[in-house]
């Protein structure tokens, strides 16, 4: 049976992550409060941020910046701003 969490990002009950993907207290908070769906949304934003801003994950400042963006996105409901990105419009 899948583990469910009350996802604070999506504001609904949803399937939880299978295991803690991020280290430390923040990782525990993500594991306990973020769903697989919300984590997937973050991963897409994270990839776009790394590419757009040419972040180097070996650089401590870049990792801190990305972690701050992740916390804002997952727990504070703030969208990640990516220069030049225009989301596709739904075509009905």
UniProtKB/Swiss-Prot annotation:
Leader sequence residues: none
SUPFAM superfamilies: YggX-like
Gene Ontology CC: cytosol
GO biological process: cellular response to oxidative stress
Statement: the UniProt record of this protein carries the keyword rRNA-binding: no
Membrane-spanning ranges: none
Keyword Iron: yes
GO MF, any single term: iron ion binding
Keyword list, A-Z: Iron
Family: Belongs to the Fe(2+)-trafficking protein family.
HAMAP family: Fe_traffic_YggX (MF_00686)
UniProt function note: Could be a mediator in iron transactions between iron acquisition and iron-requiring processes, such as synthesis and/or repair of Fe-S clusters in biosynthetic enzymes.
Protein name as annotated: Probable Fe(2+)-trafficking protein
Source species of the chain: Shewanella oneidensis (strain ATCC 700550 / JCM 31522 / CIP 106686 / LMG 19005 / NCIMB 14063 / MR-1)
């Amino acid at each position: 049976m899948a583990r469910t969490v009350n996802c604070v990002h999506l504001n609904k009950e949803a399937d939880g992550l299978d295991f803690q993907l991020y280290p430390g207290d923040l990782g525990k908070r993500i594991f306990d409060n973020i769903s697989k769906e919300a984590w997937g949304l973050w991963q897409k934003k994270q990839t776009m941020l790394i590419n757009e801003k040419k972040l180097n994950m070996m650089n401590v400042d870049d990792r801190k910046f990305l972690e701050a963006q992740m916390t804002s996105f997952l727990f504070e409901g703030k969208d990640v701003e990516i220069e030049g990105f225009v989301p596709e419009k739904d075509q009905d």
